[in-house]
């Protein structure tokens, strides 16, 4: 029996009122569609989107303007960009998991939904967030 594909908008759980979702983000078009789908499903909820540029294709800047257009969505987006290809002045780009987590922890309570999108293992983002949210 085939049980389906994991990490396609997988609900990891709700912790102290904040639902964490995990999605395997593999292409800018899919990321944009996922953000829009979550906005529709959780209409009226405050959503934090965390996007990690995980693959060489994503982190190498090969998607150009298509990747950067995601930032124009009416949404709160934090980028995890290990190779520093993204450039903006919004202060929402981080180069390490630790820096990203520290930023989220400063104001996570303002959000109802945290959507993690990466084509890498999301455990480095999900587990610290879950643990701290559960503890508070």
Question: What is each PLM-predicted segment?
Answer:
Residues 1-136:
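ATP-dependent carboxylate-amine ligase
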